[in-house]
């Protein structure tokens, strides 16, 4: 099955502490989760490692978000949208269901 949300897609968060915020997908995990740039930030306590030159402290990093809690953002309508698939010229392409425009 093809992925409806892929890397570099702009998504909007539907549920959770970052609800309503938008960002680009930086990574799609095989567990059905996404990492979105600048969203779902958590604080991680980093242990210092002098061999690698890593300073210790509290570091903010992006945590995965469940794919069902985000939707692809349609810049033409300015809203969250659903994705469908169709064949054009023998290739499978993604399109927005609200206005039938191709994704990217």
UniProtKB/Swiss-Prot annotation:
Keywords of this entry: Ribonucleoprotein, Ribosomal protein, RNA-binding, rRNA-binding
GO biological process, one term: translation
Superkingdom of the source species: Bacteria
Function: One of two assembly initiator proteins, it binds directly to the 5'-end of the 23S rRNA, where it nucleates assembly of the 50S subunit. One of the proteins that surrounds the polypeptide exit tunnel on the outside of the subunit.
Matching NCBIfam families: rplX_bact (TIGR01079)
Subunit structure: Part of the 50S ribosomal subunit.
Protein name: Large ribosomal subunit protein uL24
